[in-house]
Curated annotation (Swiss-Prot):
Assembly information from the UniProt record: Part of an E3 ubiquitin complex including rfp1, rfp2 and slx8. Interacts with rfp1 and rfp2.
Cellular localisation: Nucleus
Enzyme class: transferase
InterPro entries membership: SLX8, Znf_RING, Znf_RING/FYVE/PHD, Znf_RING_CS
GO MF annotation, one: zinc ion binding
Region of interest (Disordered), residue spans: 1-75, 166-196
Its biological purpose: Mediates ubiquitination and subsequent desumoylation/degradation of sumoylated proteins and proteins containing SUMO-like domains. Acts as a critical suppressor of gross chromosomal rearrangements (GCRs) during normal cell cycle progression. Involved in stabilizing, restarting or resolving transiently stalled replication forks. Prevents accumulation of DNA damage during cell cycle progression.
Coiled coil start-end: none
UniProt gene name: slx8
Enzyme Commission number(s) of this protein: 2.3.2.27
One Pfam family from the record: zf-C3HC4_3
Swiss-Prot/TrEMBL catalytic activity: S-ubiquitinyl-[E2 ubiquitin-conjugating enzyme]-L-cysteine + [acceptor protein]-L-lysine = [E2 ubiquitin-conjugating enzyme]-L-cysteine + N(6)-ubiquitinyl-[acceptor protein]-L-lysine
Protein name, UniProt field: E3 ubiquitin-protein ligase complex slx8-rfp subunit slx8
UniProt biased composition (Basic and acidic residues): 1-10
Length: 269
């Protein structure tokens, strides 16, 4: 076995060709790098975007093992948290200003609507003050529309002849409604026509066949039909047993044959 001084010489000779620095050389290189960074201007940290000062960063003078790394250019965690809070506070006023702009626009729109409603009211008052007659006429027309027949009981019997009532016509024209029948006959004798009863019955038309009724029959609601037409229209079910004119419920047993009644009255006379 060779002496100890020869073994050390062989180790130094093996490490020399590969230029492997010793631990003291690595520590010296690390200290030199730290000194160069301290003397150079402060760089921005990659994490939070804020500059790191020399006081906020603790640089070790060296390392004790090869696995330890140098925490270069890193700020303490507390400083990074404060910086992130400041960044959030800087963004809040921008969002709040946007909300304020939206609220102001909504309030502006509401003011426009109120102004438009006020303008409509003013126009209506101006129209009524300058043209009250036209406004009252329009209201009268609306009332007349609502006064038209709206229920079955208000329906007009179109199968019957409307009797001429001169007094009603005079009243509508604004004359004295207390005019007697004698005065009306003197004023308009041509409009007074006497029609025989036979001719009146012949003028009736069945609304189903649109012809002169055969076996003239009448429903309880006062409408005239042919006896065959009305019985065929009523049928045998409750759904169809309705008057073809006013749609009231009519049972076939309630249909009155007028010709039979007229014949019996003639025999009695």
């Amino acid at each position: 076995m060779p002496p100890a001084h020869k073994r050390d010489t062989n180790v130094r000779n093996l490490s020399a060709p590969y230029n492997i620095p010793s631990q003291s050389a690595r520590v010296a290189a690390g200290n030199a790098a730290i000194n160069r960074r301290r003397s150079s201007p402060v760089e921005n940290s990659p994490g939070n975007g804020f500059p790191v000062s020399e006081d906020a960063t603790d640089y070790p003078s060296g390392t004790t093992s090869e696995n330890e790394s140098l925490p270069l250019n890193r700020a303490p965690r507390s400083l990074r948290e404060v910086a992130s809070e400041l960044a959030q506070e800087e963004t809040l006023p921008v969002e709040t200003s946007d909300l304020n702009i939206d609220v102001e626009s909504e309030v502006f729109d509401l003011e426009d609507i109120n102004f438009q409603n006020d303008a409509d009211d003013i126009n209506q008052r101006f129209t009524y003050n300058n043209h009250p007659a036209s406004v009252e006429n329009s209201l009268t027309n609306v009332n007349s529309i609502h006064a038209q027949p709206t229920t079955i009981s208000d329906m007009i019997d179109l199968t019957d002849e409307t009797s001429y009532d001169p007094r009603k016509q005079k009243f509508e024209q604004g004359k004295n409604p207390s005019t007697t029948n004698a005065e009306i006959e003197k004023e308009e004798p041509s409009k007074k026509q006497v029609v025989p009863s036979s001719q009146r019955l012949a003028d009736y038309k069945c609304v189903i066949c649109l012809d002169s009724p055969e076996n003239l029959s009448c429903t309880p609601c006062g409408h005239i039909f042919c006896n065959f037409c009305i019985l065929s229209a009523l049928g045998t079910t409750a759904a169809t047993q309705k008057c073809p004119v006013c749609r009231r419920k009519v049972h076939p047993n309630k249909v009155i044959c007028l010709e039979m009644m007229l014949g019996s009255q003639k025999k009695k006379s």
